[in-house]
Amino acid sequence: MTNDIYFMTLAIEEAKKAAQLGEVPIGAIITKDDEVIARAHNLRETLQQPTAHAEHIAIERAAKVLGSWRLEGCTLYVTLEPCVMCAGTIVMSRIPRVVYGADDPKGGCSGSLMNLLQQSNFNHRAIVDKGVLKEACSTLLTTFFKNLRANKKSTN
């Protein structure tokens, strides 16, 4: 659990980078053998790419580092429960373990809305550990959206 807290802290640092860019503050870290091999934060608005989620970018970077699309032996740390797209990418990249901070009751596909990561009819499943630094991860998101709503009201 100590390593999980450390790596989630790094994911939170990535999420803060996203917030500074006006992106939804979500950050991701991928480790292998307790070493960080990839890090990323949301860039969807910056790149105007619907797939530029933190998890998706981190997975692409990790695959490049390892020279393989199979990310066996890796752990993905992400500040928000993965969405359907990211959960699919996790399954397809064979990541065996996912650790996330905040639940996403409206779009989470790692147990909240549905659980694609442990779907028995897929040929790969991931262990999911949730709630690591949940409060810090949740606060980043709620603060971001509160400020976004306040800014929209002040411009109207």
Curated annotation (Swiss-Prot):
Domain CMP/dCMP-type deaminase per the UniProt entry, residue ranges: 2-120
Keywords for this protein: Hydrolase, Metal-binding, tRNA processing, Zinc
Catalysed reactions listed for this entry: adenosine(34) in tRNA + H2O + H(+) = inosine(34) in tRNA + NH4(+)
SUPFAM superfamilies: Cytidine deaminase-like (SSF53927)
Active site residues according to the UniProt entry: E55 (proton donor)
EC class of the enzyme, as a word: hydrolase
InterPro entries per UniProt: APOBEC/CMP_deaminase_Zn-bd (IPR016192), CMP_dCMP_dom (IPR002125), Cytidine_deaminase-like (IPR016193), tRNA_aden_deaminase (IPR028883)
Cofactor binding note from Swiss-Prot or TrEMBL: Binds 1 zinc ion per subunit.
Subunit relationships: Homodimer.
General function of this protein: Catalyzes the deamination of adenosine to inosine at the wobble position 34 of tRNA(Arg2).
Protein name (Swiss-Prot/TrEMBL): tRNA-specific adenosine deaminase
Biological source species: Staphylococcus aureus (strain Mu50 / ATCC 700699)
